[in-house]
Amino acid sequence: MAAAFTSSPVVSQPQFTAMNEQQCFSNESIAFFYNRSGKYLATEWNTVTKLVMGLGITVCIFIMLANLLVMVAIYVNRRFHFPIYYLMANLAAADFFAGLAYFYLMFNTGPNTRRLTVSTWLLRQGLIDTSLTVSVANLLAIAIERHITVFRMQLHARMSNRRVVVVIVVIWTMAIVMGAIPSVGWNCICDIENCSNMAPLYSDSYLVFWAIFNLVTFVVMVVLYAHIFGYVRQRTMRMSRHSSGPRRNRDTMMSLLKTVVIVLGAFIICWTPGLVLLLLDVCCPQCDVLAYEKFFLLLAEFNSAMNPIIYSYRDKEMSATFRQILCCQRSENTSGPTEGSDRSASSLNHTILAGVHSNDHSVV
């Protein structure tokens, strides 16, 4: 009997711990992961949760309607059939998708979270990640397009429709891959000790990667717009010494400054707090990040509602097209481009390029 006892395998404590850490928990309930992370999982609807859900649904409806209006306006008005407007339409499509993704989230949050499986929870979060990533990537693409046109002294980028389609496909492909990464393996289901507090099924390393990726994109946008502004300011100051219209140059520079401040300010206000919160979730365990999670999530989603206003509503031609669509009026520009249509294109384009071409009457 002693021999039989000694022949049985003995698992040491370190080996047992290693085996336990490598165990996957894909069959566990969502409550299991939330309890481990310390994140509260509601059992019933309270006043705060109802208010957040009501506000979220309202924002979603506005996002979808506003961005749908932008897409229709660009489609019906042939004066908008240029690369910059195709990118703006794609941005509107991305933000429309963000509204749908967030709408899905609203009906699968709060007490409804308990009913989700691991797969559906990852799908819910993946839709949000994809929608937000594609919106940021579109903002970057627009910044790059503006940078190219200004420094080449063009009103519109000389880019073929095929290249625009390639850019759009690359943006969506990258965003879908980013959103799907946690579902295909970069999660904490088999690495339970490294689960995030804010996203209990997400790995800390993925959240750090995603936050840094978006922050780097933000920095690139700041650099691009700062370079544009510096170039235009230098040109206007140089030409004001040899022209009779310094006030016009000064007004052009200030108008550009306002546009850049609005664009960058909206991005900073809506995105930076949430991205910093993700980093604090990993780097600062004692920080109470969960207390601000829902607020910053709503704030980030507001960016999708603001993009149509920032990039489209400042355009007088776009505003007129909006009114014609809402009033069911037929636009004169839907039948085809008219002579001098380039001169009536985006006021935002004119703002950027007027300082560069202040002596070029074909742009005025």
From Swiss-Prot:
Disulfide bonds join 24-190, 188-195, 284-287. It is found in: Cell surface; Cell membrane; Endosome. It comes from the Eukaryota. It is a multi-pass membrane protein. GO terms for biological process: adenylate cyclase-activating G protein-coupled receptor signaling pathway; adenylate cyclase-inhibiting G protein-coupled receptor signaling pathway; negative regulation of cilium assembly; negative regulation of neuron projection development; neurogenesis; positive regulation of MAPK cascade; positive regulation of Rho protein signal transduction; positive regulation of stress fiber assembly. InterPro entries: GPCR_Rhodpsn (IPR000276), GPCR_Rhodpsn_7TM (IPR017452), LPA_rcpt (IPR004065), LPA_rcpt_EDG2 (IPR002277). Residues 76-83, 145-163, 226-255, 316-364 are cytoplasmic. Residues 1-50, 108-121, 185-204, 281-294 are extracellular. N-glycosylated. The modification Phosphoserine is found at residue 341. A 1-acyl-sn-glycero-3-phosphate binds at residues 39, 124-129, 210. The modification Phosphothreonine is found at residue 351. The chain crosses the membrane at residues 51-75, 84-107, 122-144, 164-184, 205-225, 256-280, 295-315. GO terms for cellular component: cell surface; cytoplasm; endosome; plasma membrane. The keyword Glycosyltransferase does not apply. Glycans are attached at residues 27, 35. It holds the Pfam family 7tm_1. Interacts with RALA and GRK2. Interacts with GNAQ and GNA13. Interacts with CD14; the interaction is enhanced by exposure to bacterial lipopolysaccharide (LPS). PANTHER family: G-PROTEIN COUPLED RECEPTOR. Belongs to the G-protein coupled receptor 1 family. Receptor for lysophosphatidic acid (LPA). Plays a role in the reorganization of the actin cytoskeleton, cell migration, differentiation and proliferation, and thereby contributes to the responses to tissue damage and infectious agents. Activates downstream signaling cascades via the G(i)/G(o), G(12)/G(13), and G(q) families of heteromeric G proteins. Signaling inhibits adenylyl cyclase activity and decreases cellular cAMP levels. Signaling triggers an increase of cytoplasmic Ca(2+) levels. This is Lysophosphatidic acid receptor 1. It comes from Bos taurus (Bovine). The lineage of its organism: Eukaryota, Metazoa, Chordata, Craniata, Vertebrata.
